[in-house]
Amino acid sequence: MGNGSVKPKHAKHPDGHSGNLSNEALRSKVLELERELRRKDAELQEREYHLKELREQLAKQTVAIAELTEELQSKCIQLNKLQDVIHVQGGSPLQASPDKVPLDVHRKTSGLVSLHSRRGAKAGVSAEPTTRTYDLNKPPEFSFEKARVRKDSSEKKLITDALNKNQFLKRLDPQQIKDMVECMYGEKLSTGSYVIKQGEPGNHIFVLAEGRLEVFQGEKLLSSIPMWTTFGELAILYNCTRTASVKAITNVKTWALDREVFQNIMRRTAQARDEEYRNFLRSVSLLKNLPEDKLTKIIDCLEVEYYDKGDYIIREGEEGSTFFILAKGKVKVTQSTEGHDQPQLIKTLQKGEYFGEKALISDDVRSANIIAEENDVACLVIDRETFNQTVGTFDELQKYLEGYVATLNRDDEKRHAKRSMSSWKLSKALSLEMIQLKEKVARFSSTSPFQNLEIIATLGVGGFGRVELVKVKNENVAFAMKCIRKKHIVDTKQQEHVYSEKRILEELCSPFIVKLYRTFKDNKYVYMLLEACLGGELWSILRDRGSFDEPTSKFCVACVTEAFDYLHLLGIIYRDLKPENLILDADGYLKLVDFGFAKKIGSGQKTWTFCGTPEYVAPEVILNKGHDFSVDFWSLGILVYELLTGNPPFSGIDQMMTYNLILKGIEKMDFPRKITRRPEDLIRRLCRQNPTERLGNLKNGINDIKKHRWLNGFNWEGLKARSLPSPLRRELSGPIDHSYFDKYPPEKGVPPDEMSGWDKDF
């Protein structure tokens, strides 16, 4: 025998019951485990039920918080409006019912209005224009390669994650986020230093990488900023003053990006994408001859769809209405053939190639299979319905390209001349009056306008300066003089916008747009001598009434629609519609004023400068995607909402919150009861997130707005001929009656001279 271990034999119970005892013990253990399992199961069910209750409570609380937040925003707006009607000197008691405030309320108040008492008035904002011809200190041409800053992969990931957690930035394209990360640069600050100072102009966005930061408003501590959090993002959209301070409590490191680089990144990526898509479309035989504006609309309609290896994009024999362009990856084309059980490979398609184009003409029975050859294949797609609504049916486009449009235009001109002779006569009379007034003021000194003019009253104030009611000395001829501080224009880099306003207004002559007669300049100001419209501001009437009824709102919307129709035909986008920029003439007709953000663009082109009023800007402006005439249609929808309710639909406790509300969209928003079904439909169709889907931007243009059911039966010809009575007309005692305007204190201080010479051609 070996020395290995020997297994002992089991002892046998003398009565032979050892096996039975073992089985009993096992059975007992099983029963005990089953009881324990049932107990645990019951406990788990109880916890799941409790968790369900907690989730339901959380959902209710979330809804309640959202409702309270919305109510708080509404109360804030109402509070601002109430404060607006309390005058600084001897403030009169508030009216019990805003709906009963008479039209001539301004004749019954005499107190001065401080600048702060107009808090309810919405202010425009703007970044530096993308073309800065008149900025003598403009930066050199942007170079992405020069702007890049080296980082390791872990830093890039942490910065990327921080940017993607931000409510605004997470909506940007992945390529834009990637480029932002590449260009952010590191900054180290010692304890006690300020990353941001309250009251100073902002120009950077930051990500906290190391250390501890706290946020203060005055001396009050508001919060601390966690590591890898993004802050200061409003400053990369446009010029703004910081509303709080951010102080380093320890030594800190941040990653920063300035506004100039951010805006160049946004423009660069969007333009590169548009150019690539345009080249794709130019390669399609059905589309290559379309004009630029049609191609641009198709580009804006294209959506990206992704497929993994083996996915069928198209199946043979199916009906289809979608056209595809391969933007990334490879696909194979297979087709059933005689003598083979399985479809046979016909060819392989790569980036830039297209398929399904017949679907744009009519229902197409697919003649082959298109199958993704690899993961993450990307296709640009557009369906026939979208194509037809946006640019027209293929037959309509063919007629357009064959020259039928010239004949149609001639017929339209004849019909228009026959239908609108009264409005043509009115336009001729307006032009004659304008020429006569221009000849009168042409004799005035270009640098000393007040040798010939005297100031009667202040009509309005703003960050730019003031608007004064002036009259020709010894004559009963009045104008509105816009006095713009040159130093302010240079500080905010708005030279291009001021020149643009001058050039555009010099070109215009419409009964729905304020007229420019002459410009002047001296060492402190540039001046615009404008038509005096003394019926008052639409904003102040809306403020006093609370809201308008539907007939009044329709009249206002119709005036704006006619102004937009005129501007867009000339290739001009307005970009700053709001009640504050609508003024009443002596007949109660509305006119657009303040063309500081207006711009002339070519057919099919876009512009990139962030500008407008926060509550009215369109999503594509916020996201720096480039924008065109469709932003005016978006703002028209917002105006309809504000006229009917007294408040714009998107208004947060700060500008960034307002932008996030806009980006969430109007589609799921509940409308108040005072907006009936038809105006609600108009608003929703004007405020589509996708610009190509907006009413006014479809194939029939602005006529779709005029023919909308809410405006059905409106007297457009009477409006253009100014024979339609205005529901907003108020009596004026003469050409210098300014009683419908708030009263303002005199300007404090004298602005410094500004002698850089940017205004030499003004």
UniProtKB/Swiss-Prot annotation:
ATP binds at residues 459-467, 482. Crucial regulator of intestinal secretion and bone growth. Phosphorylates and activates CFTR on the plasma membrane. Plays a key role in intestinal secretion by regulating cGMP-dependent translocation of CFTR in jejunum. Acts downstream of NMDAR to activate the plasma membrane accumulation of GRIA1/GLUR1 in synapse and increase synaptic plasticity. Acts as a regulator of gene expression and activator of the extracellular signal-regulated kinases MAPK3/ERK1 and MAPK1/ERK2 in mechanically stimulated osteoblasts. It is a lipid-anchor. This is cGMP-dependent protein kinase 2. Its main location: membrane. One of its GO terms (cellular component) is apical plasma membrane. CDD domains: CAP_ED, STKc_cGK. One of its GO terms (biological process) is circadian rhythm. 3',5'-cyclic GMP 2 binds at residues 347, 356-359, 366-367, 412, 415. Belongs to the protein kinase superfamily. AGC Ser/Thr protein kinase family. cGMP subfamily. Residues 712-762 form the AGC-kinase C-terminal domain. The keyword Magnesium does not apply. The modification Phosphoserine is found at residues 110, 117, 431. Residues 453-711 form the Protein kinase domain. Residues 1-26, 118-138, 740-762 are annotated as: Disordered. It is an enzyme of class 2 (transferase).
